[in-house]
C-alpha cells in the first residue's frame, strides 16, 4: 500500500493551558504552519491554536 501525504499534527493552545487538539494536514498543499481559532475548555474561551509536531 502507498503511504499517504497527510501528516498528523498537534494544535496547541496559545493561552498557555497545555490543551491541544490533534488532526491531520496535507504537507504538499499546505506547507505553512496551521493556525486556527478553536475553543479552549480550560479557559472557556475561543483562542488561537498553533501547529506543533507530535512527538
Curated annotation (Swiss-Prot):
GO terms for cellular component: cytosolic large ribosomal subunit. The keyword Hydrolase does not apply. InterPro entries: Ribosomal_bL33, Ribosomal_bL33_CS, Ribosomal_bL33_sf, Ribosomal_zn-bd. One of its GO terms (molecular function) is structural constituent of ribosome. Keywords: Ribonucleoprotein, Ribosomal protein. PROSITE patterns: RIBOSOMAL_L33. It comes from the Bacteria. GO terms for biological process: translation. HAMAP family: Ribosomal_bL33 (MF_00294). PANTHER family: 54S RIBOSOMAL PROTEIN L39, MITOCHONDRIAL (PTHR15238), LARGE RIBOSOMAL SUBUNIT PROTEIN BL33M (PTHR15238:SF1). Belongs to the bacterial ribosomal protein bL33 family. This is Large ribosomal subunit protein bL33. It comes from Yersinia enterocolitica serotype O:8 / biotype 1B (strain NCTC 13174 / 8081).
Amino acid at each position: 500500500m502507498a503511504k499517504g501525504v497527510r501528516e498528523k499534527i498537534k494544535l496547541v493552545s496559545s493561552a498557555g493551558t497545555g490543551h491541544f487538539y490533534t488532526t491531520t494536514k496535507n504537507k504538499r498543499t499546505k506547507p505553512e504552519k496551521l493556525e486556527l481559532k478553536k475553543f479552549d475548555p480550560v479557559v472557556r474561551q475561543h483562542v488561537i491554536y498553533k501547529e506543533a509536531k507530535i512527538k
